[in-house]
Design a protein with these regions (language model features):
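Individual transmembrane alpha-helix segments
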Residues: 70-94
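Polytopic transmembrane helical bundles with strong interfacial aromatic enrichment
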Residues: 2-72, 77-79, 99-134, 155-195
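Interfacial non-cytosolic loop connecting adjacent transmembrane helices
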Residues: 132-153
Length: 195
């Protein structure tokens, strides 16, 4: 007789259970990246038409009726959307791999959860940032202005991924450099002990 899913979840290693929210976000990031690829493949012309319509609807002062300026911004907007697709795939994959590495190291559940959430949420947020910047640029008349308007999303998202990745690097170094417990003299790895 098979065990129901919730019972199986309770029997998971504490470190893996702690990683599940971050792994869920990492998987969502992968689906976001793949979904954009499908949407772009099926609707590239419609998306570019929407960007052109947003540029046409912008106030006259934004582009000053300069067709060359409009083309530059529209081309760069499309590149930003492609970056969202690429970042979704790459950051989602990185988040899954690094989270599983942290679990395999036997890291404490709290540390595992923090790292996996930083990787998963950061990857998703940064991917969304590029898509949103691509859509905003056409109406604002500048990719720089679009990025600046979304700095509140880009900075913490990318920062979370970088900090979490550095934390994984530190954990790997600690895994190779056990420390001696002062009272017992036994080798310990305080951040890596799950129990």
């Amino acid at each position: 007789m098979s065990t129901p899913f919730p019972a199986t979840l309770r029997t998971l290693d504490p470190s893996l259970r702690a990683a599940l929210p971050g792994l869920m976000l990492a998987t969502l990031t992968l689906l976001f990246g793949m979904g954009l690829g499908v949407i772009f493949g099926l609707n590239e012309d419609a998306i570019k038409s929407r960007l052109s319509a947003a540029a046409a609807a912008a106030p006259a002062a934004v582009y000053q009726q300069d067709a060359a300026a409009i083309k530059v911004v529209l081309d760069k907007s499309w590149v930003y959307m492609q970056r969202a697709h690429l970042h979704g795939g790459s950051l989602g994959t990185i988040a899954v791999v690094l989270t599983l590495l942290v679990v395999l190291l036997g890291t404490r559940p709290l540390v595992t959860r923090a790292i996996s959430l930083g990787l998963g949420a950061g990857g998703l947020g940064y991917s969304v940032f590029w898509l949103w910047a691509g859509f905003r640029a056409a109406a604002l008349g500048s990719t720089g202005a679009a990025k600046e308007s979304l700095k509140w999303l880009a900075m913490p998202s990318s920062g979370a991924v970088v900090v979490a990745t550095i934390a994984v690097g530190v954990l790997l170094v600690l895994a190779f450099a056990p420390r001696r417990h002062p009272s017992t003299g036994h080798a310990t790895r305080p951040l890596l002990t799950a129990h």
